[in-house]
């Protein structure tokens, strides 16, 4: 607040938000919303995770990321945002199709918002970054993590049937 950075700050990991008492959390949620501070989670398996649903309900932008790809901290990172969406859903108890869709938004659309990306989406003139997967619904895709049939970046095919074609 003192530095005038409202809307230009994102806090990564934010493990502590998964450990605070309810009264403290309410005050923090208000401050985060008021200052437009985004929270980025990796949805870790071995640490507290920010209360994603509560954050979103309070009007806080939440994104998800994988900041380690088979590195010194974990051998499990792979930078797959569909998998990250599943982990966000799993760690936060998302069970309904609506909540599973929210997990996908967190790992895609909301990340783009935090980064200030424009032309992100599926409207005419957008970048045409997309992943094509088989599935009956978004909920099924998040829960089952089907193989990636086609991956486009900037409208260019970069992977087909799970293999890089560059």
Please state what every model-predicted region is.
Residues 1-50, 61, 70:
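Active-site core of metal-dependent hydrolases
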Residues 41-45, 69-71, 93-98, 160-166:
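Short C-terminal domain-edge/linker segments immediately following a structured domain
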